[in-house]
Design a protein with these regions (language model features):
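Small-residue-biased structural context
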Residues: 1-241
Length: 241
C-alpha cells in the first residue's frame, strides 16, 4: 500500500480514532496522539523527530480491515469502557505502584540518586490521577450519559459540561508532563544493569502506566469529548431552529 494513502495533514488523534491499530506506530515513534491529537501527522512527526515518509509507510502497512475502531456512537458504552478498562486499572495500580516506587527509592537511592526525583514525580502524579477519575465519574460522565440518552440539558448543565471538558483536558496536559518527567528520569524506561527484579518490575509498570494513559486520554480527548461537544452543538442548533 502506498504511503500516499495517508494524508499528512490529518490530525493524529483523528487517525488513531479511525484506526486504533495506528497507535502502535505512534507509540513506537513517540508521537503524541492523545494530548497532542490535534496536530497534523506532518507536524507530529517533526515534533517527535521522526521521518514522515517512514511513519506513513508503517501506517499504510496496517491492515485497516482488521483494525477498525469500535463504534463509539453510543457514548454511554464508551464511558463504560473508560471506567472499566482504565479507571479500574488506575484504582488498582496506582497505590500498588506507589509502594514499589517508595521501596526502590529507599533501597537503591544511594546508587541511583535520580530515584528521589522519580519518587517525588510519582507522588505528585498518583493523587492527581485519582482525583481526576473521581471528578470524571461524579461530575462529567453523568452529564454526558444524559446527553447521550437524548435528555434535555439545562443551560447550567451545558455550560458546566463544556467547562468540565476543558478542565479535564487541562488535567490531561498536567498528567502528560508528569509522565514525561518520569520517562526522562528513567531514561525512557531503561532497566539499569544493577536492577533487582523489583526494580525491573517498577520500570516495566511505569512504562505500562504511561502507555495505558495514552490510550485512556486518546479515548477521552479525541472521541468522547469530541462527540459530546458535537451533541451539545447539535442540541443548540435544534433548539434555535
Amino acid at each position: 500500500m502506498s504511503n500516499a494513502t495517508i494524508d499528512p495533514q490529518r490530525p493524529v488523534g483523528e487517525l488513531a480514532r479511525e484506526v486504533p491499530a495506528y497507535t502502535r506506530v505512534f507509540e513506537a515513534a513517540d508521537i503524541d496522539y492523545c494530548c497532542g491529537g490535534d496536530a497534523s501527522l506532518e507536524i507530529a512527526c517533526k515534533q517527535a523527530g521522526v521521518n514522515l515518509d517512514d511513519v506513513r509507510e508503517e501506517l499504510a502497512d496496517i491492515q485497516t480491515d482488521d483494525a477498525q475502531a469500535a463504534d463509539w456512537d453510543n457514548l454511554a458504552e464508551l464511558v463504560d469502557d473508560v471506567v472499566e478498562t482504565h479507571h479500574q486499572y488506575l484504582r488498582e495500580e496506582l497505590p500498588a505502584l506507589e509502594g514499589l516506587v517508595r521501596k526502590i527509592a529507599r533501597v537503591h537511592g544511594e546508587n541511583h540518586p535520580e530515584l528521589e526525583a522519580l519518587q517525588t514525580a510519582y507522588l505528585d502524579l498518583a493523587p492527581t490521577m485519582k482525583e481526576h477519575i473521581r471528578e470524571e465519574e461524579e461530575e462529567v460522565f453523568p452529564i454526558i450519559e444524559k446527553l447521550d440518552r437524548g435528555e434535555s440539558l439545562s443551560e447550567g448543565e451545558r455550560r458546566r459540561l463544556r467547562e468540565e471538558i476543558e478542565e479535564m483536558k487541562a488535567d490531561h496536559e498536567d498528567t502528560a508532563e508528569l509522565l514525561e518527567r518520569i520517562a526522562e528520569l528513567t531514561d525512557g524506561y531503561t532497566i539499569p544493569a544493577d536492577a533487582c527484579p523489583s526494580y525491573e518490575s517498577m520500570i516495566e509498570r511505569l512504562d505500562a502506566l504511561e502507555r495505558d494513559t495514552h490510550e485512556h486520554v486518546h479515548k477521552e480527548n479525541n472521541v468522547l469529548f469530541v462527540e459530546a461537544e458535537t451533541k451539545l452543538s447539535d442540541g443548540v442548533e435544534s433548539r434555535n431552529s
